């Protein structure tokens, strides 16, 4: 989640994908989380039994396009991006993250949409409201959150500080009557099992709801202009309402708070090159809903903020109705006690938090791993069909206190990803580094184990793509990750919004393990349904 949950966390190497004779390789069964030999002899795993699972089919023969035509596409894409605000701050310009309009450049993008089977797309959209409801129910179970993360807090200082705030809220019996969640659930299509598998559920600072819509509209525009030559139909790129739906959810939360003079506060990093994605939401709030937004860092909140006796949060003298975090998800956002004081201050107020500390913790890696255990989903959900839909999308997830799993991961590290309790690109551990870190933890003792989980490594299909960065295109083999946004708003027992809210496609070269867009690993993309 650099700049907000934006890490493309699970990757493939094209050499692995090309290998088709690994019949005796160690494979992972995401349904039962048990190792099997000769998995290729087993029937394909299915996320929904009614779906006919198929791999994305190539939609273009890239070899037939000459450089002149591709350069025309590139030129049109760059012009469109500049005219429509699909831009980021140029990291070579000192003030590009602090002064709007200074040092802008186009966002990294895929030149054309990536093929994606319509059945998987429908499935990802269908489960989004179920995941929204699950997060809300987890947030109400303080004991589950504290117990699940009890060992993690001893090994991870950042998680420990978040849990301290959560504990204080539990001790004060403070209840969040108005609860707003703007989430994103990330998936990859596993080529081996022909399954849609969830990578993670992001509950804080989910980035690119502004750019997700824009890159979709860019691709639709290019296909309307060049679709005949490309052999593509712009109508096969699904509409993306991420910007308006997130803004609408914040506006309805603002209305529920019922203070027409209050503002929405966006909590930001002091130097934010991705500010324009954030400004799109503020623009919709202002122009469509007549709601004022302010932007403050956590340090500024600590200096200017105050919680009044009635619970009202004021910052710089302005009452705040909704707090929308686009920072606060990484230890780097808390360089001093001032930032932690600000986080606690916000939590103690009556403002609607997006997310609350409980929602934030519900999206941690360890909670995700706990939910994969047999019987845990049933603690929060009654509908058996909904439980089945969620569970069948889970990849293999394990804690590091299972000696058999540790042994398997040391023997076959290429089949695992080692994940710390961190959000953002560049944190996960792959390949031989998995083995080395597991051996290190064995030497140093078990206490540090709780800072990590192990996850099945997902191997998606490799496609040929044009990647556009710094005004230059490159043709490469790449893999993609689909993130489906979800909006959830509740006031006491009344559910006001529970819906999927657009999507974010990210694509990166298949030879790279990490893939955060803001971290420089991946590009923004959209999908072409086939």
From Swiss-Prot:
Residue ranges that the Swiss-Prot or TrEMBL entry lists as coiled coil: none
Biochemical pathway: Sulfur metabolism; glutathione biosynthesis; glutathione from L-cysteine and L-glutamate: step 2/2
Catalytic activities: gamma-L-glutamyl-L-cysteine + glycine + ATP = glutathione + ADP + phosphate + H(+)
Keyword Ligase: yes
GO molecular function: ATP binding; glutathione binding; glutathione synthase activity; magnesium ion binding; protein homodimerization activity
Targeting signal (transit peptide) range: 1-52
Pfam families per the UniProt record, alphabetical: GSH_synth_ATP, GSH_synthase
Alphabetized UniProt keyword annotations: ATP-binding, Chloroplast, Glutathione biosynthesis, Ligase, Magnesium, Metal-binding, Nucleotide-binding, Plastid, Transit peptide
Residues binding substrate: 184, 204-207, 272-274, 278, 326-329, 506, 517-518
UniProt-listed SUPFAM superfamilies: Glutathione synthetase ATP-binding domain-like, PreATP-grasp domain
Cofactor(s) for this UniProt protein: Mg(2+)
Manner of cofactor binding, per the entry note: Binds 1 Mg(2+) ion per subunit.
Residues involved in Mg(2+) binding: 200, 202, 423
Gene3D superfamilies (alphabetical): 3.30.1490.50, 3.30.1490.80, ATP-grasp fold, B domain (3.30.470.20), Glutathione synthase, substrate-binding domain superfamily, eukaryotic (3.40.50.1760), Glutathione Synthetase, Chain A, domain 3 (1.10.1080.10)
EC number, UniProt record: 6.3.2.3
GO cellular component assignments: chloroplast; cytosol
PANTHER family: GLUTATHIONE SYNTHETASE
Family: Belongs to the eukaryotic GSH synthase family.
Name of the protein in its database record: Glutathione synthetase, chloroplastic
Originating organism: Brassica juncea
């Amino acid at each position: 989640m650099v700049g907000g949950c934006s890490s493309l966390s699970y990757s493939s190497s094209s050499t692995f994908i090309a290998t088709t004779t690994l019949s005796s390789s160690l494979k992972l069964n995401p349904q039962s989380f048990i190792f099997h030999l000769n998995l290729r002899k087993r029937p394909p795993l299915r996320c929904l039994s009614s779906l006919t699972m198929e791999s994305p089919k190539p939609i273009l023969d890239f070899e037939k396009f000459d450089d002149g035509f591709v350069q025309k596409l590139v030129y049109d894409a760059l012009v469109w991006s500049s005219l429509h605000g699909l831009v980021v701050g140029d990291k070579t310009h000192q003030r590009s993250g602090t002064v709007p309009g200074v040092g802008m450049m186009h966002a990294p993008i895929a030149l054309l949409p990536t093929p994606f089977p319509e059945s998987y797309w429908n499935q990802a959209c269908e489960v989004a409201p179920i995941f929204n409801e699950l997060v809300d129910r987890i947030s109400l179970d303080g004991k589950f959150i504290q117990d699940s993360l009890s060992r993690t807090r001893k090994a991870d200082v950042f998680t420990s500080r978040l849990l301290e705030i959560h504990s204080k809220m539990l001790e004060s019996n403070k209840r969040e009557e108005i609860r707003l969640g703007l989430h994103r659930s990330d998936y990859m299509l596993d080529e081996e099992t022909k399954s849609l598998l969830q990578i993670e559920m992001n509950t804080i600072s989910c980035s690119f709801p502004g750019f997700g819509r824009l890159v979709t509209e860019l691709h639709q525009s290019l296909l309307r202009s060049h679709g005949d030559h490309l052999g593509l139909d712009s109508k096969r790129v699904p509409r993306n309402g991420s910007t308006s739906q997130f803004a609408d959810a914040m506006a309805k939360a603002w209305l529920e708070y019922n203070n027409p003079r209050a503002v929405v506060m966006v909590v930001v990093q002091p130097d934010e090159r991705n500010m324009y994605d954030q400004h799109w939401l503020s623009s919709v709030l202002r122009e469509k809903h007549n709601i004022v937004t302010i932007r403050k860092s956590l340090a500024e909140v600590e200096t200017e903020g105050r919680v009044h006796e009635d619970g009202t949060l004021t910052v710089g003298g302005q009452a705040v109705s909704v707090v929308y975090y686009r920072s606060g998800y990484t230890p780097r956002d808390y360089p001093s006690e001032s930032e932690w004081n600000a986080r606690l201050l916000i939590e103690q107020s009556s403002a609607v938090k997006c997310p609350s500390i409980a929602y934030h913790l519900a999206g941690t890696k360890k909670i995700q791993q706990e939910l994969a255990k047999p019987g845990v989903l049933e603690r929060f959900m009654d509908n058996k069909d909904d439980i089945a839909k969620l569970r069948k999308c889970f990849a293999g997830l394990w804690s590091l206190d299972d000696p058999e799993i540790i042994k398997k991961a040391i023997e076959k590290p290429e089949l695992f990803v080692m994940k710390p309790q961190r959000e953002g690109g560049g944190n996960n551990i792959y390949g031989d580094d998995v083995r080395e870190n597991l051996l290190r933890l064995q030497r140093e003792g078990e206490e540090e184990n709780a800072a990590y989980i192990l996850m099945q490594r997902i191997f998606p299909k490799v496609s040929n793509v044009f990647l556009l960065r710094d005004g230059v295109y490159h043709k490469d083999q790449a893999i993609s990750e689909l993130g489906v946004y979800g909006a959830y708003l509740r006031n006491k027992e009344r559910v006001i919004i529970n819906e999927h809210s657009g999507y974010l496609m990210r694509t990166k070269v298949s030879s790279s393990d990490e893939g955060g867009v803001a971290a420089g690993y991946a590009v923004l993309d959209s999908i072409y349904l086939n």
